[in-house]
Amino acid sequence: MESRIKVLVVDDSAFMRKVITSMLESDPRLEVVGTARNGEDALKKRKTLAPDVMTLDVEMPVMDGIETLKRLMSENPLPIIIVSSTTKEGAENALTAMELGAVDFITKPSGPISLDLEKVRDLLIEKVASAPNVKLKPTSKKAPVVFRPLQQPVPFDKTIIVIGTSTGGPKALKQVLTKLPKDLPAPILIVQHMPAGFTESLANRLNSLCEIHVKEAEDGEIIRPGVAYIAPGGYHLETKRLGTSIALHLTKEEPRKGHRPSVDVLFESVSALSSIYKVAVIMTGMGSDGTEGLEQLKRGSCYAIAESEQSCVVFGMPKVAIERKLVDEVTHLELIADSIVRQCKR
């Protein structure tokens, strides 16, 4: 019998420690070896209990989750799942934590008697059970990739870029989008698996770092070149023709493969736009979201890029697309922006 995955639960709320422990122990693959009420307590228990995975609250007394995460990742990294509140501050903290090396996050259940609890439980179990397989990488010491800016923009009506990603996506998106020039002659539509309330913070953070404009997508807006639109958490992102323009459409249709927004839904919608060249990018993430949509995109004029196993945090979504032979190029995360730019110049 396989040994169980050992988990340390860190939260300043006794009630939340109990709820999370109960959720995790409902799965036979997981064993909660201990709990801690703050960061200092967590650092001590990490040494004595040797957990495989840690769930970590952010807002705690004595030592908060961000400081705890910094210490853990600099001394002896382990996979950490952030347990975040759904407030704007909680969203910002979760994004900061992922930049510092946390592998993923979930939002706290909203109450003890709630349908929300069951959803959170299934998500928490999935993320914790897969966390030991996630690659933990130190910050790259390699020389930055030299970026060659576009010399001659091409009209927008020729190209549209679509990106799908999940676990590890916020850091991957930062790597790609910060290397794109402000005069990029194509719009970018992005699905990042995230709950409602978090995608706006992600868009704002990326916008402050990028030459292109990055924003959360809004229903009915006309897409423009040089702008990246991130699907809001809880909504599918689709496109529709409006005369010679293309507008965004947000829907609350059922989740696909458990996801809303879904990469498949975006890719399938964009595949229906005739006479437009599509550049599709699938990056780090669990599961196979995006593969069905990519099959439809490839029936038309589409160049598909998959992130290589070498740079993926989780080599799931790209792996499936590669195995189905739907991909034209497999490349390291640091080179994806360069590939996108080359396709815009074709």
Swiss-Prot record:
Instruction: Name the residues annotated as catalytic in the UniProt entry.
Output: S166, H193, D289
| Description of post-translational modifications | Phosphorylated by CheA. Phosphorylation of the N-terminal regulatory domain activates the methylesterase activity.
Q: What is its EC number?
A: 3.1.1.61, 3.5.1.44
The record's GO CC annotations read: cytoplasm
What residues does the CheB-type methylesterase domain cover? 155-346
Q: Where's it found, cell-wise?
A: Cytoplasm
User: What residues does the Response regulatory domain cover?
Assistant: 6-123
Pfam families the UniProt entry points to? CheB_methylest (PF01339), Response_reg (PF00072)
InterPro entries membership? CheB-like, CheB_C, CheY-like_superfamily, Sig_transdc_resp-reg_Me-estase, Sig_transdc_resp-reg_receiver
Which positions carry 4-aspartylphosphate?
D57
Spans through the membrane: none
Has UniProt tagged this entry with the keyword DNA-binding?
Answer: no
Please give the Gene Ontology molecular function terms for this protein.
Answer: phosphorelay response regulator activity; protein-glutamate methylesterase activity; protein-glutamine glutaminase activity
Q: Name one GO biological process term.
A: chemotaxis
Q: Which UniProt keywords apply?
A: Chemotaxis, Cytoplasm, Hydrolase, Phosphoprotein
Q: Which reaction does it catalyse?
A: [protein]-L-glutamate 5-O-methyl ester + H2O = L-glutamyl-[protein] + methanol + H(+); L-glutaminyl-[protein] + H2O = L-glutamyl-[protein] + NH4(+)
Describe the task this protein carries out.
Involved in chemotaxis. Part of a chemotaxis signal transduction system that modulates chemotaxis in response to various stimuli. Catalyzes the demethylation of specific methylglutamate residues introduced into the chemoreceptors (methyl-accepting chemotaxis proteins or MCP) by CheR. Also mediates the irreversible deamidation of specific glutamine residues to glutamic acid.
Written domain comment of the UniProt record:
Contains a C-terminal catalytic domain, and an N-terminal region which modulates catalytic activity.
Q: Which family does it belong to?
A: Belongs to the CheB family.
Q: What is this protein called?
A: Protein-glutamate methylesterase/protein-glutamine glutaminase
Lineage from the top down? Bacteria, Bacillati, Bacillota, Bacilli, Bacillales
